[in-house]
């Protein structure tokens, strides 16, 4: 199949995936008026049909659409061309009938901003890589020293009280407009409280499950950051009980206007990658023959994130130029990377450990550009081996 035809098929598949994600968001929004929900679902159905061949589009009515959203997505998507992806078997609702945490990120990462969509969805929506770019456009205006400070703060202070955040961000505080009030985010509130993830400090999602709530970090639940919340019988917060191996004790904070958090895009594409970089730095710290530089560029500190050098006497030096990524979809990440002008050869893209099984898919997309793909744990083992240190 010609390259142009493969690209067109992939665009139609992205369009259908976007429609499904948007429909799930509409279906699961508890405050959306029924009339508004119906109109949004009709919009989504129109976009989905437009992605299919006419004979298949005629077979998908509203009943088939809504039923299809409750199971694996394969029957709703145009066939994949070339290398298969994971979306045929993906389900957007969980076992409790609630939208999966990642739906919003998948939607923004696969959104096709073209006229065919805009005629159905006139509201402004921005591709994920454009939001990522907006963040780093602000960052690039900082001096190298300020840039490194801001990147670190995105990882360590992405949410909290206004007093604490302004103290930590200090002179950088007034230069960022990415913070929003937790009081405006009902999805993370329970009994007037919110719980920061012990890993990223961002608000954890609270989902009612019978008389209790499931509380989990959207990004770190695979690592065991999830809890069960029991409603309080009196004043004050209820009881939060860990249900995962990484569910350490967390202090509840009031869901008031003086508690802020970076917006979702900054958390996904700013905070989470920094945490991967800091995790890697901390795991490798103290190894013999090792030198590490965080955001090393003086002219362009954002060129890549971490430079690792291993210089064992009598052996050739080993270098890793690391760029951490925390996209929900490695398919969309691969397309964004291949479209990026001047992608540096010799770069190593590092993914979270829970995307280990997907790293080969991304590697196949960027291999021709001289870029390698691995995960945090795999790279840490490789560097330790190069240093001659025990794993």
Tell me what each language-model feature is:
Residues 240-298:
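Acidic-basic catalytic patches of nuclease active cores, encompassing PD-(D/E)XK
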Residues 280, 284, 304-334:
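Conserved catalytic cores of phosphodiester-cleaving nucleases, focusing on short active-site segments
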Residues 324-372:
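Catalytic cores of nucleic-acid endonucleases
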Residues 212, 298-309:
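Beta-rich nucleic-acid/ligand-interaction surfaces
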Residues 94, 137-145, 250-255, 357-365, ...:
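Metal-dependent nuclease catalytic core centered on acidic motifs
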Residues 372-391:
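C-terminal helix of von Willebrand factor
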Residues 299-301, 314, 341-344:
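A structural signal for short secondary-structure junctions
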Residues 3-250:
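Nuclease-adjacent, charged terminal/linker segments that flank catalytic cores
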